């Protein structure tokens, strides 16, 4: 039996928890497409500063379209929560990927992969800056990897071969 998170979103599993939200892996009922759905408690949003932060995040995500920035697909709302339905990045965060690779192979990421990742990160930052958007929390934990793209699959296979 599937558990509904909100509307037509089926809960698959909890991915993580932040200061003011929880993130779930979800799918639309009857679809194999997967999403990362951020569930934000409206109690947090009752603080004007927090509400402004949430509104800004939604406005920015709706306005941007770049292959290296997570896409916002939908915003849902109930009496208790806001739900931001975004692209799911199945590779996790860069910090964990670096640690896992180091643990498994006892060496750092191959230089070719580092160069590839840096190119993608710089491309995303350049895009945001051209739109006069400043990301104030760039860190390895906030850089997500998606292996579902053709390029992502090639890089993942390369990592496994090194």
Predicted regions and their residues:
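Conserved N-lobe beta3->alphaC-helix segment of eukaryotic protein kinase catalytic domains
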Residues: 34, 39-64
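Catalytic-loop of the protein kinase fold
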Residues: 129-146
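AlphaC helix of the protein kinase catalytic domain
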Residues: 95-109
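Conserved N-lobe loop of protein kinases adjacent to the ATP-binding glycine-rich P-loop
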Residues: 27-34
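A short, aromatic-enriched beta-strand patch in the conserved N-lobe beta-sheet
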Residues: 74-75
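Conserved short submotifs of the Hanks-type protein kinase catalytic core
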Residues: 80-93, 97
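Activation segment signature within eukaryotic-like protein kinase domains
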Residues: 117-118
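Conserved N-lobe ATP-binding subsite of Hanks-type protein kinase domains
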Residues: 22
């Amino acid at each position: 039996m599937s558990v509904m998170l909100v509307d037509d979103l089926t809960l698959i599993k909890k991915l993580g928890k932040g200061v003011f939200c929880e993130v779930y892996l979800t799918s639309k009922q009857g679809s194999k497409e997967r999403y990362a759905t951020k569930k934000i408690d409206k109690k947090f949003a009752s603080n004007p500063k927090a509400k402004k932060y949430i509104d800004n995040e939604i406005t920015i995500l709706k306005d941007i379209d770049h292959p290296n920035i997570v896409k916002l697909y939908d915003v849902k709302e109930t009496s208790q929560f806001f739900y931001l339905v975004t692209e799911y990045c199945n590779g996790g965060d860069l910090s964990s990927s670096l640690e896992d690779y180091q643990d498994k192979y006892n060496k750092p990421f191959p230089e070719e992969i580092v160069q590839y990742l840096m190119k993608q990160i710089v491309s995303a930052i350049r895009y945001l800056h051209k739109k006069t958007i400043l990301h104030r929390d760039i860190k390895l934990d906030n850089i997500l990897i998606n292996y579902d793209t053709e390029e992502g699959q090639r890089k993942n296979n390369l990592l496994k071969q090194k």
